[in-house]
Amino acid sequence: SDVYKRQARTCGELLRPVTLELGGKSAAILLDDVDLAANIEGLFQATLLNNGQTCVANTRILVPRSRYQETIDTFATLMSGAVIGDPLDPQTQVGPLVSDTHRTRVEKFIAGSQEQGARLVTGGSRPAQLDTGWFVEPTLFADVDPASTLGQEEVFGPVLAMMPYDTIEEAIAIANSTKYGLAGTIWTADEARGQDIARQIQSGTVGVNYYMLDPVAPFGGIKASGLGREFGPEGLASCQQLQTIYLATT
């Protein structure tokens, strides 16, 4: 974020327009009527795509307390059984991180989350079967404080934070409680209800039972997640300079 702030300052000094797509700490909100079995693959993609190394990763999972343990168990089974390995192998579900330096950063998040009281459910280590490569096991924390470091900061790795909620108003408040506003999802059997909740999320893009960017629709963030839009007519408009020509009518 500091780098992008410097870029924005430089563009301001030069009076140059700029589009900035920055980080995110997006939330997947599961409603009480969600069909976990039907949606778990979509949730896996939304939360752990590219090993969590995507700006739109929904790395906070907000779950109604009545479905909390069930959801923890479902995710733990999926994540602990994920195939880790060569990203060129079609069977691989979780590949390496981008560098050794970044893996060290992710591991510091994991250690710090335990120190701050989050409950480690699965993962948290380097996979024992892989002695080369910058791998980290898919890691799930439960009982994460929304105000903690893991609840607020972008990890950019395969580390998920699960949090219970008691009312949908509380879930919306938690989802909106970070400095970011890039993405998010709502998971429910009632699509109309999901759309209503999506409109209350302070985020540039929100999916209902699905998340995938579409180049015909504008993409971008609000708050600390960026300025401007990519894709769609709005993205093209940012590359244009308008000119008005006036003609006399007499």
What residues fall within each predicted segment?
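ALDH superfamily catalytic-core signature
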Residues: 2-145, 208
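Conserved C-terminal structural/oligomerization subdomain of aldehyde/semialdehyde dehydrogenase
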Residues: 29, 77, 83, 94, ...
